[in-house]
Amino acid sequence: MVEQRGMLNNQLSKVPYLQLSEADVIAQTASQSFDISVWQFLAAPLFGARVDIVPNTIAHDPQGLLAHVEEQGITVLESVPSLIQGMLAQDAIALDGLRWMLPTGEAMPPELAHQWLLRYPQVGLVNAYGPAECSDDVAFFRVDMASTRGAYLPIGTPTDNNRLYLMDEALELVPLGAVGELCVAGTGVGRGYVSDPLRTALAFVPHPFGAAGERLY
């Protein structure tokens, strides 16, 4: 269960980061059962943009999707890296109108990001990370060529009104270079799991140094 305010915060945080305006066309590619479908479908009315509802058969066809993006003038596309890999496996399509590609749902391999930037240097590449339990995206990272030289792409910085912590099992902050678990606090953190209080109690815990009643995921 997530709050309406968390989902709205996710939508609003994308507007300044991606510099969205009434000139944009957002591709709605996700199933209605997935969290990312909410922002894909509902963010555009916030700033007067257009939503292009992509047919399911096209949304899962790498080359068909790119052709659709070009034909419909789509400016913002979110996709999983495995589909992006298929997009780059064949001849290039111009994508003159696309402004942003947001890989999400899987870890984006640095080499794949490198290949994308080589083919489409004019299209901004933003690594989007976030669990459904926290109202979709909680971090963005603008990928450039330098960042593709590492073993992993960074998760990035928190989205508006969310906070990220790297913590140990005792919920203590770990020092730089140490291994820890990524924990999320802020507006995006949901209520918990429906009819599963035990799982909720294990995953949504009191924030050890937050405001009274605040929780971490």
Model-found features: residue ranges?
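Alpha-helix capping/helix-boundary segments
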Residues: 82-84, 108, 189
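AMP-dependent adenylate-forming
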Residues: 7, 118-127, 139-217
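Gly/Ser/Thr-rich phosphate-binding loop
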Residues: 46-51, 74-78, 88-154, 160-163, ...
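His-Asp-centered acyl/peptidyl-transfer active-site segments
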Residues: 21-22, 28, 38, 94-97, ...
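A generic "structured core" feature
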Residues: 1-3, 7-10, 20, 26, ...
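Conserved AMP-binding
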Residues: 20, 30-34, 57, 107, ...
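Conserved AMP-binding/adenylation subdomain of ANL enzymes
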Residues: 2-27, 35-75, 145
